[in-house]
Amino acid sequence: LISETAEMCPNSPYAASKVAADRICYSYFRSFGLDVTIVRPFNVYGERQKSGLYGALIPILVGKALRGESLTVFGAGEATRDFSHVSDIVRGYNLVLNSDKLKGKAINFASGVNTSIKDIAEYIAKKFHVSVIHTPARPGEVMRFPADISFARSLGYSPRVGIWEGIDRYIEWAKSNRY
């Protein structure tokens, strides 16, 4: 599990940019005493999220499925992620805003459950009767990215929306918004 104190070893420029932002925020706390809390939401998805060239996995897959296209999975799809519904992340941010115990600390917000990319693609494909195709794995792909949310739980955080319910909510939103 990836805790708030785990060493950060980014495998891609995108991941490195996130680590850099994290460390810049922390440096303002250390250097100037700013009231900074570093919030680390894991793989957020949900209603109103757009797909597109740089979109997130679930909106991209649902968008393709709505158009009747095959869903593309890189590699075997065995990589797992800790997907977090936006409503759970909003509750996490509210926790941070209303806590006086987090100055200078990092906190993970996630579901606490890892789901494979393949399982998500197959779930969406089945709902829309489209196929899943596999292409070569992307360079630098992280195979597992499980969040340790025990610190957040100790402060009262409790994710409520499971991955399948969250995907269903997103699908309904996408359909009703002609997305």
Where on the chain are the PLM-derived regions?
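Catalytic helix-loop patch of NAD(P)-dependent Rossmann-fold dehydrogenases
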Residues: 1-38, 50-53
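Glycine-rich "substrate-gating" loop/helix at the edge of Rossmann-like oxidoreductase active sites
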Residues: 11-14, 42-54, 75-87, 113
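Active-site phosphate/pyrophosphate- and oxyanion-stabilizing loops and adjacent acidic/basic residues
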Residues: 26, 59, 122
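Short, hinge-like loop/turn segments at secondary-structure boundaries
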Residues: 55-57, 151
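C-terminal substrate-binding subdomain of Rossmann-fold SDR/epimerase-dehydratase oxidoreductases
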Residues: 63-179
